[in-house]
Curated annotation (Swiss-Prot):
GO CC terms in record: cytoplasm
Active-site residues, Swiss-Prot/TrEMBL: 15
Family of this protein: Belongs to the selenophosphate synthase 1 family. Class I subfamily.
Cofactor(s) the record lists: Mg(2+)
EC assignment: 2.7.9.3
Gene name tied to this protein: selD
Sites where the protein binds Mg(2+): 50, 90, 227
Molecular function GO terms recorded: ATP binding; magnesium ion binding; selenide, water dikinase activity
Catalysis: reaction(s): hydrogenselenide + ATP + H2O = selenophosphate + AMP + phosphate + 2 H(+)
Enzyme kind, highest EC tier: transferase
Protein name as catalogued: Selenide, water dikinase
PANTHER family tied to this protein: INACTIVE SELENIDE, WATER DIKINASE-LIKE PROTEIN-RELATED (PTHR10256:SF0), SELENIDE, WATER DIKINASE (PTHR10256)
Organism name: Nitratidesulfovibrio vulgaris (strain DSM 19637 / Miyazaki F) (Desulfovibrio vulgaris)
């Protein structure tokens, strides 16, 4: 039997299928808030955070998130692991530890065999086991397009929360995974020459848990972090800069890039979601003369289960890189936090 190409069954792959940031911003702006329950919300929707932090009776707090998307790879087990790793990342990004999770399934039962879904769920279950989180249920609907993800609940110390609003001038920025998953996923979906190798590289990185980075946040009590996903490194930096009232400077020549990504981007294999990210951000971005247009595309590439971006003070750099090395995670220095630049520039690509 021929191999089923899951990516051919969907319009857009992975986090590139997200609603464009500008559209989402307009939609959410009209949602009302309920003042009667605001006192239980420690971190909510104000700064586009990775997850919510909610206060419970008795002094405990939980972190909650959900994430689901369409396939970015063809192997169903790999897709399940990637989707679970991506959902877990939001908990790690806040400084929490995953506790339990529930599956979210949209499945075309008339077009794909049940074995596909079984393998997807097995991949998700294995990722949760690695994270030490319990799978406690889920919900499924029949859909024209395959989608999978999880709702994750974690435990968190309310005194140790990393947020988008915690950047401070002088902080160094460390990234824990190379960039380019959106571009590789585009090549896989296009069945581009060499796409099997691209798919293996994609799985290798996108299935890695950001567990080690979460440990760094807790042990060093970091104030700012985010996982780099659908809005790209540039888009997430812009969110953090706006929430913190600072400017973020990214050193484009230092950006870690997955094998083959720059060549593919140079040929125009950039997902539509990445173009939307760049268009949404352009008013607050300054690109220095001489910066490669391809690296600008990489900076805004819509990542799926990307790395953690950690804001680390100069005196914490050695400790952060040591802790990451202990769990086998890279620590790529990609930029720094500056005082606000004139003209509303929140992101400098230099």
């Amino acid at each position: 039997m021929s191999r089923i190409r899951l990516v051919d069954s969907v319009k857009a792959a992975g986090u590139a299928a997200k609603v464009a940031p500008g559209d989402l911003e307009r939609i959410l702006a009209g949602l009302p808030r309920d003042p009667s329950v605001e006192d239980r919300v420690i971190v909510g929707t104000r700064h586009n955070e990775d997850a919510a932090v909610v206060r419970l009776p008795g002094g405990q707090s939980i972190v909650q998130t959900l994430d689901f998307f369409t396939p970015i790879v063809n192997d169903p087990y790999h897709f399940g692991r990637i989707a679970a790793a991506n959902a877990l990342s939001d908990v790690y990004a806040m400084g929490g530890e995953p506790w339990c999770a529930m599956n979210i399934v949209c499945f075309p039962v008339k077009r794909l065999p049940e074995s596909i879904l079984a393998d997807i769920l097995r991949g998700g279950s294995d990722a949760l086991r690695e994270a030490g989180a319990a799978l406690v249920g889920g919900h499924s609907v029949e859909d024209d397009e395959l989608k999978y993800g999880l709702s994750v609940t974690g435990l968190i110390d309310p005194e140790i929360i990393a947020s988008n609003a915690g950047l401070r001038p002088g902080d160094h920025l460390l990234l824990t995974k190379p960039l380019g998953t959106g571009i590789l996923a585009t090549a896989v979906k296009a069945n581009w020459p060499g796409c099997d190798a691209h798919e293996e590289e994609l799985f290798r990185w996108a299935s890695r848990l950001n567990k080690g980075a979460g440990r760094v946040i807790r042990e060093l009590r970091l104030k700012a972090a985010t996982d780099v996903t659908g809005f790209g490194l540039g888009g997430h930096c812009l969110e953090m800069a706006g929430a913190s009232g600072v400017t973020v400077a990214l050193d484009t020549a230092a950006l870690p890039v997955l094998p083959g990504v720059t060549e593919l981007a140079g040929m125009g294999l950039v997902p539509e979601g990445s173009h939307a990210n760049r268009a949404h951000c352009h008013k607050h971005v300054h690109v220095a003369p001489g910066v490669s247009p391809v690296l600008v595309d990489v900076a805004f590439d819509a990542q799926t289960s990307g790395g953690m971006l950690l804001a680390v003070s100069p005196d914490q750099m050695d400790a952060a890189t040591t802790l990451l090395a202990e769990t086998g995670d890279p620590a790529y220095p990609v930029g720094e936090v500056l005082k606000p630049l004139p003209g509303g520039v929140r992101l400098l690509l230099r």
